[in-house]
From Swiss-Prot:
Keyword Ribonucleoprotein attached: no
PANTHER family assigned to the protein according to its UniProt record, in alphabetical order: MTFA PEPTIDASE, PROTEIN MTFA
Primary site of residence: cytoplasm
Listed EC numbers: 3.4.11.-
Protein name: Mlc titration factor A
Amino acid sequence: MIKWPWKVQESAHQTALPWQEALSIPLLTCLTEQEQSKLVTLAERFLQQKRLVPLQGFELDSLRSCRIALLFCLPVLELGLEWLDGFHEVLIYPAPFVVDDEWEDDIGLVHNQRIVQSGQSWQQGPIVLNWLDIQDSFDASGFNLIIHEVAHKLDTRNGDRASGVPFIPLREVAGWEHDLHAAMNNIQEEIELVGENAASIDAYAASDPAECFAVLSEYFFSAPELFAPGFPSLWQRFCQFYQQDPLQRLHRTNDTDSFSATNVH
């Protein structure tokens, strides 16, 4: 039986939060009881420190809040909640939203257009999400909007802009950059060979180093079996940075399931 941290708290608010139900999503079932307990402790603190702001009529209940907090804290389970400093609000639309985008082309001309976004992470501002894509982040598919945006926040701790290199020791930067760009090249080669829809990794990862880090962070936590075999050196760097090994968790869970199945009479 898990000794859940909220069960020993005197606070009625903490006791009322549906953490056990929130943990029931497929993405979190590979965690050990100890990891789940630690994750809930971080998520409780996250909800105390951050403000979740529903927009455009979206209804935010306690279960949704708990699951959002758990997904935010999964990448920093071993790093610590202080890695999520730098923002205080999470804005949540009910669905993908339209924003005005401004960009400069190769010859210096500035263009303006309206585009549909799933999420945004401002360096000195809030994280913006949408509930439809948050729901799609509960499974183990390789897609996770919250982890993607958290990865951008972790990335910018290393400098003024997202570069694809998180805050790691200086001696490791060159190796990280080498392996990250090699992964981008391999992903692009696969796209050219089989097309975007058939590629094993989301094509967005090949667009730019910062997006590669964010996309591969999604796969690291939600589809490690697709990330690790294709990019073993970069996988080890991610394990070292996040101080977690989701593939080992997956194998442990599969072994447990296999053992249980063979002992059913």
